[in-house]
């Protein structure tokens, strides 16, 4: 218990700066026309401002603290976004505009894959975004709820794809990851399912 308390007390949350909604970017049509998947990344890190802009574009608060930039079924907001970096793993809290530390250290290998199959290009990207479906918020684990959660995770991932294309970042949507390892690391229940991920970074010149 003492070790747990000590670990929590040492957690380093990141209060993100306000999103820059006037940042220079391509139009939606231009982003759609040029969007493509990228699997090689520069080692350049993303600043806190860039992380704020990225997370907001993915599933941030759009208005009135009750709506998100990405739609969800019945506005259930059941998609949780986790940010894997070299230093730690964070959960993005949209209302607070905060990255809440959930685990220290570099755990991006879990996003790359399993011992049987891994795509190590993921380790080049400074950030990986992992989408988790919280079925509790959808009302159950029936087939319909799972399907709606998967659709909503796809909506979130497409926000990643289009935002990255619009501002000069790059990404690729993926389903491969060590689901069991991520679930254990994040302390998820059997109703909280890691479903998709997007490594994000700058293109490698």
Predicted segments with their positions:
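Short linear sequence motif anchored by a di-proline
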Residues: 9-10, 184-185
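N-terminal amphipathic, basic helical "cap/leader" segment at the start of enzyme domains
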Residues: 10-125
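Generic beta-structure capping elements
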Residues: 19, 132-134, 201-203
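Small-aliphatic-rich amphipathic alpha-helix that forms the alpha element of a beta-alpha
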Residues: 35, 54, 81, 127-138, ...
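Short coil/turn connectors at secondary-structure junctions
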Residues: 124-127, 191-193
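A glycine-rich helix N-cap at a beta->alpha junction
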Residues: 187-205
